[in-house]
Amino acid sequence: MKKIIFILLLFLANPIVKGQIADRFTCMTTIGTGISMNTPSTTPFAWQVTGHYKLSERFSAGIGTGLSVYEKALIPLFADARFQLTKPRRVVPYLQCGIGYAFAPDEDANGGFFFHPSAGVQYKMHGKTTLLLSIGYEIQNLERLKKYESSHYAAEFREKLHHNLISIKLGVML
């Protein structure tokens, strides 16, 4: 009988423990640009939406997508992890890392590997709204089809690009 009561208490305690972390799901959107670290130099524009699930008070993981524009438009799909360096308060520094693959909707391009570690700070505003500012390093691989035509000949080749850049992003988390 004692074993049955103990097992029932364990099952009843589980919802109590999970109830201690408020708002387990968060959604964030960011826009950003970067400083290219290689040639050919391209200043990208990036917009991302990420959904996170809080695994603890300071660590969350989720998935994201968005739109990145380099020479061609890319749609990244990535896994994302985020760790807050201090306990939750008005201003909190954090580390974040996204890794995945970017797809190219254009038939003249192929996407590639995507990796984006960053460090940032979040500032809690009214209610659940939080502002985000981050600086990171982004790696984006891309393959595009280049065509050249003149009156004498026509050429077509695939060019593999490896973008490495320092990224700056501003966003909102709800």
Over which residues does each language-model region extend?
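Extracellular/periplasm-exposed beta-strand and loop segments of Gram-negative cell-envelope proteins
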Residues: 38, 70, 103-110, 142-149, ...
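Outer-membrane beta-barrel initiation region
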Residues: 20-29, 36-43
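Outer-membrane beta-barrel "beta-signal"
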Residues: 81, 160-174
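Outer-membrane beta-barrel pore domains and translocons
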Residues: 30-36, 66-68, 84, 98-102, ...
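A contiguous, mid-protein "functional segment" used to position or interact
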Residues: 130-132, 136-139, 145-150
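Polar/charged side chains located within well-ordered beta-strands of beta-rich proteins
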Residues: 27-29, 49-51, 137, 164
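Gram-negative (and chloroplast) outer-membrane scaffold detector with strong preference
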Residues: 41, 45-131
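Bacterial Sec-dependent N-terminal signal peptides
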Residues: 1-25, 170, 174
